[in-house]
Amino acid sequence: MPPDRSMPASASSSSAPEALPSACADCPSGRTLVAQGQCCQDFRRALGSFATGVTVLTTLDADGRACGMTISSFNTVSLEPPLILWSLALSSPSLETFRQASHYAINILAAGQQAISNRFASRVADRFEGVDSRPGLSGSPLLEGCCAWFECRHEAVYPGGDHLIFVGRVERFARQTSEAPLIFHGGAYARLATSED
């Protein structure tokens, strides 16, 4: 927090700095502050200022069962070779499934697929129930109606604080130019502006 500029400089400089708490009171885990005077919730809200697309990550587990979850931490790494990345919290129940997966698919959700995003972010027993999909190259489900699909082979995984960062090599992709993407911004869904807006 900047000093109070209404105070005389001499008074401001002679004041002892305000003691900062050693942990974030807003966090049940009591995590330490991410920056001086700022907590992890503030950090999360600031990150929410950056609009992202919404994706559903899918794969098959060791028993051949479909597994999927909503993520927004998707990005490109390289065009040659074609590499993408995404991250997953160490606390995620799906972490081991994706660590062991040799292949997975990234489904880029379209603007009308908010319900699918919510479903794959929920704790329902079968997230695929009522969702149309087809198997990809490796068997990973490709959700119907998406803007784009990236079928990937696991390339590498790196530690990243309280997350793991996964890098995938794209083996096949497809897109639908007629579909606008689903957008997430500031903790809520949004849509792209059109020329009429």
Task: Map each language-model feature to its residues.
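Basic, polyanion-binding surface patches
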Residues: 2-197
